Amino acid sequence: MLAKATLAIVLSAASLPVLAAQCEATIESNDAMQYNLKEMVVDKSCKQFTVHLKHVGKMAKVAMGHNWVLTKEADKQGVATDGMNAGLAQDYVKAGDTRVIAHTKVIGGGESDSVTFDVSKLTPGEAYAYFCSFPGHWAMMKGTLKLSN
């Protein structure tokens, strides 16, 4: 009898939905200079957050490369401008730029890359932006990242 009751409790608990935080996101880029997501939400209970970037287009990275760069909203334009001068060899991100919270490498069609960053780098209430720093892309390929409760 006790075994049946224990089994019933275990099976009931196993059927409950898992409420763990989602500490990763996948974003796609394409040959039309677009991301498929305009917003990402990071649960503040996550210690780290991973972004998986996939280029679903066909063009090479020298012609239509994309990356994913995270900064404060106020720093976006300056980081993008400085990134253009850094060049493809630096993934269009100025070396040592402390305004950059995280970034992937520049990828071409059919490629993917991931980046993981510490959520402790994010401040509640701060406005964050992500964008592609490939020259000419940042004005179109952008979105917001929010820290949630």
From Swiss-Prot:
The keyword Signal applies. Gene3D superfamilies: Cupredoxins - blue copper proteins (2.60.40.420). InterPro entries: Azurin, BlueCu_1, BlueCu_1_BS, Cu-binding_ET, Cupredoxin. Keywords: Copper, Disulfide bond, Electron transport, Metal-binding, Periplasm, Signal, Transport. The keyword Calcium does not apply. One of its GO terms (molecular function) is electron transfer activity. It comes from the Bacteria. SUPFAM superfamilies: Cupredoxins. Cu cation binds at H66, C132, H137, M141. Disulfide bonds join C23-C46. Residues 21-149 form the Plastocyanin-like domain. It is found in: Periplasm. Residues 1-20 form the signal peptide. One of its GO terms (cellular component) is periplasmic space. NCBIfam families: azurin. Transfers electrons from cytochrome c551 to cytochrome oxidase. This is Azurin. The lineage of its organism: Bacteria, Pseudomonadati, Pseudomonadota, Betaproteobacteria, Burkholderiales.
